[in-house]
Amino acid sequence: MARRVLGQGHPGALPLWEHFVLNELHARLQTRDVRYWRDKQGHEVDFVLARRGRHPVAIECTWSVDAFEPAGMRSFRGRYPEGESFVVAPDAVPASTRTVGGVRVRFVDLETLVRALGKR
């Protein structure tokens, strides 16, 4: 949606995409267990699904799979090694899994992310 409205290169497009993903997670998963993570060095993960008794799920939003920068995810997984790591991007079709920067990451579109998280 944000990609259509503002265009990929627009400076406000990525925050709009992140907000859209957050709204979809809240609405479709019916949860408020979505958090944000940032360390003192400035590494961050857009969203962390922190459900009681389960390993944290890390979610990064990006416009394309090629634009993913693994520093935040790597720092998060260094501290919390258990759990899945997702990158949600409009062009992540078909979904794929690969290791980037030493972290195993699943690249998915938004619909695939919601379906995968809904099964947990």
Residue ranges and their predicted role:
Residues 1-120:
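A cross-kingdom feature that marks ATP-driven nucleic-acid transaction machinery
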